[in-house]
C-alpha cells in the first residue's frame, strides 16, 4: 500500500473544501503554502561529553488571524512534511472554534526515550536558542505535543526569557506549562471536556432530550479517553459500556466501573483487559457495538471502508486525530450517522491553551469553573456554526467544518489586503 504524503493530504482536503465555497484561486494557492518554514540544527551535549546534532523544524502556516499556535513534537520518525501538514490543520482547528490564531507546529527528529532527563533539558533549551527569533507571545506560541510535556515547556519558557533578557516572566510565549509558572489546572481534561460539550450539542441536534442513560463506547484510554469516561458518566449521566487501550478492551452492557477504578486497574495491570465484572473485547469489536455514541480516541484510520458499514452508533465523536478514513466518511454519511469531525471535536485542548495565553498576557487568572464555562461557550458555538453549515449546504460535517474554518481565514486575508477577492 502506498502511503500518502501528509502535506499532500492536507492540500487535497483544502481543495475539496474549496468546492463548497466562493474562494479565489490566488487565496487558495496561498493557503496551500506555509508562510514560514524554519529548519534548524539543534546541538546537544550528551551525558558522556560528546555532542550530537539533531534536526528541528518550526512551521508557521498562516498568521492572517493572529499569532501562530501549535505543539512541539519529539519523534524519531518526524518529517518536515508531517510538521507542515499539522501546521496547516492547526490553522483550521483554531479557526473553527474562532480563536485569534493561525496554525503552527514544531518538531525535532529524536527518540526522547533514549535521552536522560538532563539531555532532554539541554535539547529543549538548544531548540529554543535555534528558533527564539521566530517565536514569541505575539508571533508564534508553542505547546506540548508528542513526547513533550509541561516540564519541557517550562524549560523552554525559561530559556526564552534568558535569551530575551526580560525583567519579568514571559509566560505567554508557551502554553501547556505547569500551574506554578503560568499554566492552568483546567488544561488536564480540556480535550475530553471540549469533546463532551460537542457530544451534548450533537445529541440536541438529533432531538435527544439529554444524555442520561445513553450508551457510549470509547476506544483509547490515554488522557482523553480516561477523562471522557469520567466526564460522560459522572457529569452527564451516560452509561459507558466499553473502553479499550492498545492491548484490547472491556465491555459491560450495564455499564463499566467508575473511570478512576478502570484507570487504577490499567496502571496496575498494564491494560484495561481482564477487569473483574467485564468481558474482554477487541478494539475492532468495540467499534461495532450497539451504542448511541462511539468515541474513537486513540489512533488514526480505525474506521475504514471495511468496517464502516458495521458501525451502529448514531453519533461518532472523533476525539482522536483522523480516526475515520475518507472512504468511511462517505459510508457513515450515507447511513445517517452524525459525525463530529476531529478538528472540531478535539479542539478543547487548544481552546484552553488560548485561555492560558490570555491569562498570561493579562496577569489575571480565572477559576477552573470560569475556564470551563468559557470552554463550553466556545465549543457550543463552534458545533452549531458547523452543524448549521452542514444543513444549509447539505454537505458532510467534515466539509462543513472546513468551510467554516477556511472562510474565516480567507476573510482575514481579504481584510488585510493580501488578496483582492
Swiss-Prot record:
EC number: 1.4.1.3
Compartments (UniProt record): Cytoplasm; Chromosome
GO biological process, alphabetically ordered: glutamate catabolic process
Subcellular location, principal: cytoplasm
Chain's gene name: gdhA
Family recorded in the similarity comment: Belongs to the Glu/Leu/Phe/Val dehydrogenases family.
Top-rank lineage group of the source organism: Archaea
Catalytic activity line of the entry: L-glutamate + NAD(+) + H2O = 2-oxoglutarate + NH4(+) + NADH + H(+); L-glutamate + NADP(+) + H2O = 2-oxoglutarate + NH4(+) + NADPH + H(+)
Full protein name: Glutamate dehydrogenase
Annotated organism of origin: Thermococcus kodakarensis (strain ATCC BAA-918 / JCM 12380 / KOD1) (Pyrococcus kodakaraensis (strain KOD1))
Keywords per UniProt: Chromosome, Cytoplasm, NAD, NADP, Oxidoreductase
Amino acid at each position: 500500500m502506498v502511503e500518502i504524503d501528509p502535506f499532500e493530504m492536507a492540500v487535497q482536503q483544502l481543495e475539496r473544501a474549496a468546492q463548497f465555497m466562493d474562494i479565489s484561486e490566488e487565496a487558495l494557492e496561498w493557503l496551500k503554502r506555509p508562510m514560514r518554514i524554519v529548519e534548524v540544527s539543534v546541538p546537544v551535549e550528551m551525558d558522556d561529553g560528546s555532542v550530537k546534532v539533531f534536526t528541528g523544524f518550526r512551521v508557521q502556516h498562516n498568521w492572517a488571524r493572529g499569532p501562530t499556535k501549535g505543539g512541539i513534537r519529539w519523534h524519531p520518525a518526524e518529517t518536515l512534511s508531517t510538521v507542515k501538514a499539522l501546521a496547516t490543520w492547526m490553522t483550521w482547528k483554531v479557526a473553527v472554534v474562532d480563536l485569534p490564531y493561525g496554525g503552527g507546529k514544531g518538531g525535532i527528529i529524536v527518540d526522547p526515550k533514549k535521552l536522560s532527563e538532563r539531555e532532554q533539558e539541554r535539547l529543549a533549551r538548544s531548540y529554543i536558542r535555534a528558533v527564539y527569533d521566530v517565536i514569541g507571545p505575539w508571533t508564534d506560541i508553542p505547546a506540548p505535543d508528542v513526547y513533550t510535556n509541561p516540564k519541557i515547556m517550562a524549560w523552554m519558557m525559561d530559556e526564552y526569557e534568558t535569551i530575551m533578557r526580560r525583567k519579568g516572566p514571559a509566560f505567554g510565549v508557551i502554553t501547556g506549562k505547569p500551574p506554578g509558572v503560568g499554566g492552568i489546572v483546567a488544561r488536564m481534561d480540556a480535550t475530553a471536556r471540549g469533546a463532551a460539550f460537542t457530544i451534548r450539542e450533537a445529541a440536541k441536534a438529533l432531538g435527544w432530550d439529554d444524555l442520561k442513560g445513553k450508551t457510549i463506547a470509547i476506544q483509547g484510554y490515554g488522557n482523553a479517553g480516561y477523562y471522557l469516561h469520567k466526564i460522560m458518566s459522572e457529569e452527564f449521566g451516560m452509561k459507558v459500556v466499553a473502553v479499550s487501550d492498545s492491548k484490547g478492551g472491556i465491555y459491560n452492557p450495564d455499564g463499566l466501573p467508575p473511570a478512576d477504578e478502570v484507570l487504577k486497574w490499567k496502571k496496575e495491570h498494564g491494560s484495561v483487559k481482564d477487569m473483574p465484572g467485564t468481558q474482554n473485547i477487541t478494539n475492532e469489536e468495540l467499534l461495532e457495538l450497539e451504542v448511541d455514541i462511539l468515541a474513537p480516541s486513540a489512533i488514526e484510520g480505525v474506521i475504514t471502508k471495511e468496517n464502516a458499514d458495521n458501525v451502529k452508533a448514531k453519533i461518532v465523536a472523533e476525539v482522536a486525530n483522523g480516526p475515520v478514513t475518507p472512504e468511511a466518511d462517505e459510508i457513515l454519511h450515507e447511513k445517517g450517522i452524525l459525525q463530529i469531525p476531529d478538528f472540531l471535536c478535539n479542539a478543547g485542548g487548544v481552546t484552553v491553551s488560548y485561555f492560558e495565553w490570555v491569562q498570561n498576557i493579562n496577569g489575571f487568572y480565572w477559576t477552573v469553573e470560569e475556564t470551563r464555562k468559557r470552554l463550553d461557550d466556545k465549543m457550543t458555538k463552534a458545533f452549531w456554526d458547523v452543524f448549521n453549515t452542514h444543513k444549509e449546504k447539505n454537505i458532510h460535517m467534515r466539509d462543513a467544518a472546513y468551510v467554516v474554518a477556511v472562510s474565516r481565514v480567507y476573510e482575514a486575508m481579504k481584510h488585510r489586503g493580501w488578496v483582492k477577492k
